[in-house]
Amino acid sequence: MNHQSEKINHILEALPYLINYSGKTIVIKYGGAAMVEEELKASFAEDIVLLKYLGINPVVVHGGGPEINSLIKSLNLNTQFIRGHRVTDEATMEVVEMVLTGKVNKQIVSLIQEKGGKPVGLSGKDGGLAIAEKYLMEVEAEDGKSQKIDLGLVGEITSVDPNIILTLQREGFIPIISPVAMSKEGQTLNINADTMAGAIAQALHADKLILLTDTPGILIDGQLVTGLKKVDIHGYIKTGQISGGMIPKVECCLGAIDSGVKRAHIIDGRVPHSVLIEILTNQGIGSLIEQG
């Protein structure tokens, strides 16, 4: 087979996926190394723009942990994580919103626009997109009893109004969403970006939810597991084989598929064009989470 024929075959491999996902919505959580390394930033932006021009509707929800950590450190503020959630006081909340909505969001918008897309940056506070309430984390104490931990100004989404996203999509724009929301009382709350992505995927009845990470996917005993069912995940969390920042990722995937999102994926954002590999190739990449 000559080189040109090989290229054509690679393009044709994508055909059934293009037919399947044409006009559909895919929510992508963008974070980790893919937001730091220049090559990965460029390849991610290219993936998003290409998907839009192919007739697929990508919605990007982003994190920004490294940028937040850097500014918190320079301001001599303390930071703590519990099961992947940042404990957030008022000073930290100011930093979080400034970095996520004021800086990182606009950087992503600029990058995607540079690649030929029409991105629009917003946060969960804009257009009443996401309403949240304070999140009290339930954990098991040493005596086996359940207890709740106050994480400060950390929220959990109670409702999502997708109208602003749907309006942007109809006009050909790509929504880029910062994970900051507001309570009914007007209090600004920090939302875990994975959790925000899952809630938005549910509200949009997305076909796919994709979370970019700095691991090959879900690792159990150091080995990549390419397919997991709900019952497996609960067991792995209980035994500690899934822990730390991976817990909110798998929990948001489970919530999404429970609410009608067809497929949820945790993939390696360190691989250039990982989003296209997952959506448009037979092999895919990372871990698939499904019902069962």
From Swiss-Prot:
Disulfide bonds: none annotated. Substrate binds at residues 64-65, 86, 190. GO terms for biological process: arginine biosynthetic process via ornithine; L-arginine biosynthetic process. It catalyses: N-acetyl-L-glutamate + ATP = N-acetyl-L-glutamyl 5-phosphate + ADP. The keyword Nucleotide-binding applies. One of its GO terms (cellular component) is cytoplasm. It is found in: Cytoplasm. Signal peptide: none annotated. Gene3D superfamilies: Acetylglutamate kinase-like. The record marks 29, 249 as: Transition state stabilizer. Pathway: Amino-acid biosynthesis; L-arginine biosynthesis; N(2)-acetyl-L-ornithine from L-glutamate: step 2/4. CDD domains: AAK_NAGK-C. Its EC number is 2.7.2.8. GO terms for molecular function: acetylglutamate kinase activity; ATP binding. SUPFAM superfamilies: Carbamate kinase-like. Keywords: Amino-acid biosynthesis, Arginine biosynthesis, ATP-binding, Cytoplasm, Kinase, Nucleotide-binding, Transferase. It is an enzyme of class 2 (transferase). Catalyzes the ATP-dependent phosphorylation of N-acetyl-L-glutamate. Belongs to the acetylglutamate kinase family. ArgB subfamily. NCBIfam families: argB. PANTHER family: N-ACETYLGLUTAMATE SYNTHASE, N-ACETYLGLUTAMATE SYNTHASE, MITOCHONDRIAL. This is Acetylglutamate kinase. It comes from Leptospira biflexa serovar Patoc (strain Patoc 1 / Ames).
